């Protein structure tokens, strides 16, 4: 399959303005894709070479290298390329422009050998990109530059443009997983009605390329039988939230398992033979940060082929007490991880089992999963089952909640133990409900919102971005709906970081997956997630989240708390959750005694 075809689709995808068109064009691309390479094409359109969970390096070639490679490929001086870059501001366009100018020479002689421009094959491109990503050690910089220069030398202008953006890590077509799943269902199932089958398979085996390969080469029927596979992450099950224990017990039909809600890092742990791999909440491979945990798991969890889930929590080695989750940050260091492991010891608190020795446990009710988990865990002081009780009265739940908090937990997770209490991979539902200690403020909880636009500041901050247009995620439509403009809570350092982040992601037009009536100074590709707290949720004509007759919902007095790099935009707070928070808040106001309202 020719790479040229893909580059042309990239160009068309970038210009599209609606989500529906995006899906249909993507489906068109899949129809024209040779089935053997569809997995690679899926990775490429998402700007990567492989799924994050592989832990394999992505390219991320810096500007300087690219300038060198472009100059080398097209016979320009580096200063010329730099100058052009200053004028245009996009190295992809620079490559496009310089490649277009190489006209005097016939394409054949320019390209060299007997390969014509436009003849690049997808696998050839992919393999060369893999070489660039994986070459390390002395001299590797020069090798990378040479390989890339060779590649764009053979490319057409449009191929060169997208290759440059790809290796720079700026191919931001903003095609989320949901759009790919829709397009796969339409292309290979025949209609969007097949989406649930494709989605279920993806939830259990979160490798989009692999799912595309199975459906394209073996058909939709094959997807129905997919089960979790150690080594490939499962999309995590998520909890709903409620601030009131009474309501929670009602939702649970009067009886539930109540776990401590530990404040650490979620870990999905896979064992396949001798190999133990740990995936984060975002399904990134974090094994290297927790080599100690992999050893504990090998030692204390019986079996050779399983997937379990738990929370990694820093502990005081002397007292065994829980420590603040910030201590885990030290484990992110690239160097001296061994020291961080020694200095900041952790324990693992397991709360679920999804797969054991060939058997899919995700379809079994929670009591069965937990019983097996207890059975396979040997007694030890590093890996524990999450502290829990079975509560059948509201006061029991309340009491346990306070106990959890007093021991340093963040609250409790209340979990259904009914016959339908399966592990709902990849979805947020009422089978798990979180009750957290910070449900005291007016707006019950913080929200995680996606940056979709930015505004320049005035006065002291003139010329710099100082506020952000934020959106919630609407999973049904797979779009981002605006809910507030955040201008406070940033430290000076965070403001500086913000300039960099926005400059990398800004775009001229609104992204097709963004629904907004407000027009910011610059639009931003929906990629960054920030945690935000506000005073309350109100109806507003300005915002598009949950828009009804009276307007949309908006967060008043929003304040930035921190970036949530561990979340992808599709993990942001949903429109549905904002609606639920709003209804809760209304109910609270109605329930207040009259005199308090005066
Ligand atoms: N016993 C437990 N059962 C399930 N999850 C737990 C448990 N203890 C701690 N957790 C953690 O709680 C998280 C969910 O709650 P929280 O809202 O604090 O996190 P979040 O990442 O902001 O939200 P979410 O994961 O629901 O999107 C889980 O992702 C998991 O890491």
UniProtKB/Swiss-Prot annotation:
Its EC number is 6.5.1.1. Its cofactor is Mg(2+). InterPro entries: ATP-dep_DNA_ligase, DNA_ligae_ATP-dep_bac/arc, DNA_ligase_ATP-dep, DNA_ligase_ATP-dep_C, DNA_ligase_ATP-dep_cent, DNA_ligase_ATP-dep_CS, DNA_ligase_ATP-dep_N, DNA_ligase_N_sf. Keywords: ATP-binding, Cell cycle, Cell division, DNA damage, DNA recombination, DNA repair, DNA replication, Ligase, Magnesium, Metal-binding, Nucleotide-binding. This is DNA ligase. Belongs to the ATP-dependent DNA ligase family. Gene3D superfamilies: DNA ligase, ATP-dependent, N-terminal domain (1.10.3260.10), DNA ligase/mRNA capping enzyme (3.30.470.30), Nucleic acid-binding proteins (2.40.50.140). ATP binds at residues 259, 266, 281, 311, 351, 428, 434. Signal peptide: none annotated. DNA ligase that seals nicks in double-stranded DNA during DNA replication, DNA recombination and DNA repair. GO terms for molecular function: ATP binding; DNA binding; DNA ligase (ATP) activity; metal ion binding. PROSITE patterns: DNA_LIGASE_A1, DNA_LIGASE_A2, DNA_LIGASE_A3. GO terms for biological process: cell division; DNA biosynthetic process; DNA recombination; DNA repair; lagging strand elongation. Pfam families: DNA_ligase_A_C (PF04679), DNA_ligase_A_M (PF01068), DNA_ligase_A_N (PF04675). The active site is at residue 261. It catalyses: ATP + (deoxyribonucleotide)n-3'-hydroxyl + 5'-phospho-(deoxyribonucleotide)m = (deoxyribonucleotide)n+m + AMP + diphosphate.
């Amino acid at each position: 399959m020719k790479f040229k075809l893909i580059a042309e689709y990239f160009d068309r995808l970038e210009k599209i303005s609606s989500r529906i068109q995006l899906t249909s064009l993507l489906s068109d691309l899949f129809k024209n894709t040779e089935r053997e390479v569809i997995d690679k094409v899926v990775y490429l359109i998402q700007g990567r070479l492989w799924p994050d969970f592989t832990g394999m390096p992505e390219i991320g070639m810096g500007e300087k290298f690219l300038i060198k490679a472009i100059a080398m490929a097209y016979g320009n001086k580096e200063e010329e390329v730099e100058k052009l870059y200053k004028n245009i501001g996009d190295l992809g366009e620079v490559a496009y422009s310089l490649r277009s100018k190489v006209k005097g020479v016939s394409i054949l002689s320019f390209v060299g050998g007997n390969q014509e421009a436009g003849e690049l094959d997808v696998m050839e491109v992919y393999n060369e990109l893999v070489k660039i990503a994986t070459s390390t050690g002395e001299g590797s910089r020069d090798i990378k530059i040479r390989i890339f220069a060779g590649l764009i030398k053979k490319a057409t202008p449009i191929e060169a443009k997208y290759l440059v953006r790809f290796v720079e890590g700026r191919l931001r077509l903003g095609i989320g997983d949901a759009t790919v799943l829709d397009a796969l269902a339409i292309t290979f199932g025949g209609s969007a009605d097949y989406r649930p089958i494709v989605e279920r398979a993806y939830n259990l085996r979160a490798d989009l390329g692999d799912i595309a390969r199975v459906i394209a080469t073996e058909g939709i029927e094959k997807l129905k039988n997919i089960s979790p596979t150690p080594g490939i992450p499962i999309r995590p099950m998520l909890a709903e939230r409620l601030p009131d224990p009474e309501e929670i017990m009602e939702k649970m039909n009067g009886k539930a398992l109540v776990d401590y809600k530990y404040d650490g890092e979620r870990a999905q742990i896979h064992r396949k033979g001798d190999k133990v791999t740990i995936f984060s909440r975002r399904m990134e491979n974090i094994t290297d940060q927790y080599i100690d945990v992999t050893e504990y798991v090998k030692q204390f969890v019986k079996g050779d082929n399983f997937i379990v889930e738990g929370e990694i929590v820093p502990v005081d080695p002397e007292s065994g007490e829980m420590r603040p989750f910030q201590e885990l940050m030290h484990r992110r260091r690239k160097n001296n991880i061994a020291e961080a492991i020694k200095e900041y010891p952790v324990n693992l608190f397991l709360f679920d089992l999804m797969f054991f020795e060939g058997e899919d446990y995700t379809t079994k009710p929670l009591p069965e999963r937990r019983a097996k988990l207890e059975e396979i865990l040997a007694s030890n002081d590093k890996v524990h089952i999450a502290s829990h009780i079975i509560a059948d009265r509201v006061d029991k739940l309340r009491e346990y909640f306070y106990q959890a908090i007093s021991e340093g937990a963040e609250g409790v997770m209340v979990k259904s133990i009914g016959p339908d209490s399966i592990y709902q991979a990849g979805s947020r539902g009422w089978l798990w409900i979180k009750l957290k200690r910070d449900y005291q403020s007016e707006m019950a909880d913080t929200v995680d919102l996606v940056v979709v636009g930015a505004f320049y500041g005035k006065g002291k901050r003139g010329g710099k971005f100082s506020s952000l247009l934020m959106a919630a995620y609407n999973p049904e439509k797979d779009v981002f709906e605006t809910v507030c403009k955040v201008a406070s809570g940033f430290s000076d350092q965070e403001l500086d970081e913000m300039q960099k982040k926005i400059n990398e992601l800004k775009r001229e037009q609104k992204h097709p997956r963004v629904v907004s009536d407000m027009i910011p100074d610059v639009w931003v590709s929906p990629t960054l997630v920030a945690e935000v707290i506000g005073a309350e949720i109100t109806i507003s004509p300005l915002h598009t989240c949950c828009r009804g007759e009276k307007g949309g919902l908006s967060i008043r007095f929003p304040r930035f708390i921190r970036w949530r790099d561990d979340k992808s935009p599709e993990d942001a707070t949903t429109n549905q959750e904002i609606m639920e928070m709003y209804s809760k808040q209304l109910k609270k106001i109605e329930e207040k005694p009259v005199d308090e309202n005066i």
